[in-house]
Amino acid sequence: MSAIINFFDIEKNINTKPVLYLVKTDKEKRICKSIIEKYHSYVPSFKSVGRRIDWLIEYQDELVGMIGIGSSTYPPPKDLLRYLNISKEEYRKTFNSFANNWRFCLIKKIPNLGTMVLKEMRCNAGIEWKKKYNNDLHYIITFVGEGRDGAVYKADNWVRIGETSGLPKHKSVSMKWDDNKSLKNKFVKPTGENK
């Protein structure tokens, strides 16, 4: 038996992990905004309230999207309280240890990229949250739009904790979803886990 290894192929595959760049400048913020408005299929809004940390995503030396976390939701989803076995008051007291994966938008479909990005985001989120806000980040929650199954989150071992009842009919101006049924699935992941 004989074997050969092609070092040129190995070299080509060295940078197969996505790189997340912390958004700091106005130019980078404009790029994030443009990606969301152009490519996010069901909530093409760049607006958010409260804390926020965004990253631009590069894969094989090409810009392929953005991902961001921000302040969690208040009032807290009942399923989250049940899952963590805490009261609304306990959640309020530890509010700054929760983040919401407020946006995740990829420009291209690349197999397994979404899961790799989520892992990188989790590895960076707690560090950046502590640096920027001086709070420990314990959980990241996300909401998945109706008609989507959250496959990328499931592949990264996030736990589906429930389903929302939708949004109120009066839809306050801060709500960015199309209708009261658009917001459905909720997933949560303790940060830094690598299962």
Regions found by a protein language model. Give the residues of each.
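Short, structured coil/loop segments at alpha-helix boundaries
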Residues: 25-30, 81, 172, 191-192
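Acyl-donor binding region in acyl/amide transferases
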Residues: 22, 51-53, 59-60, 66-186
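Intrinsically disordered, low-complexity and often Lys/Arg-enriched segments
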Residues: 1-4, 193-195
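Conserved beta strand-loop-helix elements of the APE1-like EEP
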Residues: 185-194
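Short amphipathic alpha-helix that is part of the acyltransferase structural core
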Residues: 2-50, 56
